[in-house]
Structure formats: C-alpha cells, structure tokens
C-alpha cells in the first residue's frame, strides 16, 4: 500500500477533497526528514517508510501527531521505540562505514 494511503488510513480519512490531500502530502514531506533524523537514518539515504515494521509504525504515529498538532508529545510517548530503531540504524551505519575503512587500510 502506498505511504499516502497508509497515512490516510491512520488518520481515519475516509473522504476525498483537495485540501485534505494537500495537507496529508505536506505532513508526509515534513515527517520524512524528521523521522530520518530521529531514527538515525542518513539524511541522504533513501528510505521507504511504507514497508511494515517499527519505522513504518513510528512514521504513521508521527503523522497522526502532526495531524492533531501535538508533535511536542511524540518523543516522550515513543522514546523507547525511537531509541530501539535508532540503535539498529546506528549499528548498521557503523558496520557499513567500518567496512569501508577496512577496505581503505
């Protein structure tokens, strides 16, 4: 399912109008770099938040908080999940860069 459709489902949007569609697109565009930073995903990396998993769950939750203008509560409510995802991505990045350093040596 496309990310925009997942977000609409999470937000319980069952109607279709141009203003709502644009707002959802704006929320997704805003959420992508924010969630990459929070989760330790390189800003330059392309990441598909539509793939089921913890990152997808957190992305959709962040969109819900943004929809309701309550993003100030997101970090506190999802701190453990964010930390777990961040640790996984930081280890993956370390292994990736360590491998590059070994090849250069």
Task: Mark where each language-model region is.
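Alpha-helical structural signal
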Residues: 24, 60-61, 78
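Conserved short "hinge" loops at termini or chain/domain junctions
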Residues: 1-53, 88-105
